């Protein structure tokens, strides 16, 4: 699948906003903490198309250590590279999984949760 084909597929369900010629922000109606929208981008690396959070998730949950991020990502089938959550995009299920993972992160590290 080309980047343009992937982008057209994503746009069948979500609005996007161009950041650069090879990167689009995917708009969802979800937030990490009530203020920060889910940071999901579709990015063309040239050799593959990926979903990427641009490292913004760790900026919201800054108290979470690198090792914990690494473990969470590996456990749930994501890459964690240079503080970025990454997953290759092969189809819409990858995007749904990315959204579900960010939902999981938002619930796990909810700053309003007294147990956290």
Feature locations, PLM:
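N-terminal ordered "arm"
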Residues: 1-49
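Extended hydrophobic/Leu-rich segments
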Residues: 6, 10, 14, 40, ...
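Generic ordered-secondary-structure signal
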Residues: 10, 59, 108-112
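Generic marker of "main functional regions" within proteins
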Residues: 20, 36, 61, 112-115
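Intrinsically disordered, low-complexity regulatory segments enriched in Ser/Thr/Pro
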Residues: 37-87
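Solvent-exposed, charged helical/coil patches
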Residues: 79-116
């Amino acid at each position: 699948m080309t980047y343009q084909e992937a982008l057209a597929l994503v746009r069948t369900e979500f609005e996007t906003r161009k950041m650069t010629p090879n990167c689009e922000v995917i708009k969802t109606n979800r937030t990490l903490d009530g203020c920060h929208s889910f940071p999901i981008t579709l990015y063309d690396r040239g050799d593959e198309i990926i979903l990427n959070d641009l490292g913004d998730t760790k900026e919201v949950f800054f108290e979470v250590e690198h090792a914990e991020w690494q473990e969470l990502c590996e456990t749930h089938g994501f890459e964690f590279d240079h503080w970025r959550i990454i997953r290759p995009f092969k189809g819409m299920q990858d995007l749904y999984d990315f959204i579900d993972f960010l939902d999981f992160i938002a619930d796990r590290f909810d700053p309003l949760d007294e147990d956290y």
